[in-house]
Amino acid sequence: MERLLITLILVCTMNNITNAQNPFYGQYHTPHEAVPFDRIETEHYEPAILEGIKLQNAEIEAIIQNPEKADFTNTIEAFEESGKLLDKVVAVFGNMLSAETNDDLQELAQKIMPLLSEHSNNITLNEKLFARVKEVYNQKETLQLTQEQKQLLENAYNSFIRHGANLEGEAREEYRRLTTELSKLTLTFSENNLKETNAYQMLLTKKESLAGLPEIIIEAAAETAKNEEKEGWAFTLHAPSYIPFMTYSDNRDLRQKLYMAYNTKCTHDNEFNNIDIVKKIANTRMKIAQLLGYKDYAEYTLKKRMAENSKSVYKLLNQLLEAYTPTAQQEYKEIQELAREEQGADFVVMPWDWSYYSNKLKDKKLSLIHI
């Protein structure tokens, strides 16, 4: 009866919100259910995320309150199917936050991310839920499961373990605190990086500064400057602007200027400095890993990867280094020789020269004609 009541509540809730003017509720009704970004507004995210959290909490409660013995269907499969709305919204929100953010999205992220971290902890640290998952896991050898079901069971159980399900007392609360802190730190790091990237512009006002650049890149730079109500050509640290400039610009000083701006992001004495943030992230990750019984965060992360441990990673890197070094040295020699043909015998190729001269070498070897 109680399980039926919870199900009815879920159905009623979904019926109510489906009628709302929010694209996240219900199907998108687009080809292949592609995300309708043109219909999604900033104000749609928060209510949908909060509703998604509420719905998944109800779904988790239904699993816990199920009077039947825990089995693959009523526990593992039910857990896998939970949180569909939340996953749907968070996937879009996360992508927009990293690819096309704005002040409103960043402000919302500061509010939402701690809630998502808390929600995740509430699930993986739920003792009753983990008890049912563990009950199914302990009888995995006797269950008639397909390979896919076995993998899902293994993944579900290990995910709980990796997210603190076996911790007790103060260790459990410390895990909550550390993961919440880590979510805030990583968000701040990403926001600082994005803000500093967006804030930088190299404005050129002399036509001769554009030597070597394709016309399409010059036009794009002029449009960027125009959008900022500036005269000239504006180049940014975004890939569509940065990469072509480093590849084609004949002006070495400007290449160096843009290169240094790109590679020293968030290290300057301003509000976007990430140096202390990086240290805090590393230390917090270390504490989490050690709390879970690992030597360090690398060991924790690699446990579920193909490499499995740091030793295997370094072994592979050393093998690659040995295999690729002769080729890299030959390529550098060819690029250095080409650069010296143009600039003189004392010229030394620097990092901001690499894309420029490697592109010239490619053109020379392949006899490419740029249209």
Language-model region placement:
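Bacterial Sec-dependent N-terminal signal peptides
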Residues: 1-21
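N-terminal helix-rich structural modules
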Residues: 21-214, 219
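Glycine- and acidic
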Residues: 34-41, 94-98, 161, 263-271, ...
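Alpha-helical coiled-coil heptad-repeat register
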Residues: 57, 161, 176-179, 186, ...
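A short, flexible low-complexity segment enriched in Lys/Arg and Gly/Pro that occurs
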Residues: 73, 143, 224-225, 259-277
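Active-site-proximal, well-structured secondary-structure segments within enzyme catalytic domains
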Residues: 152, 184, 191, 196-236, ...
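A conserved hydrophobic secondary-structure block that centers on an alpha-helix together
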Residues: 164-175, 265-280, 287, 291-298
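Active-site-adjacent "gating/activation" loops or surface patches in catalytic cores
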Residues: 230-266, 354
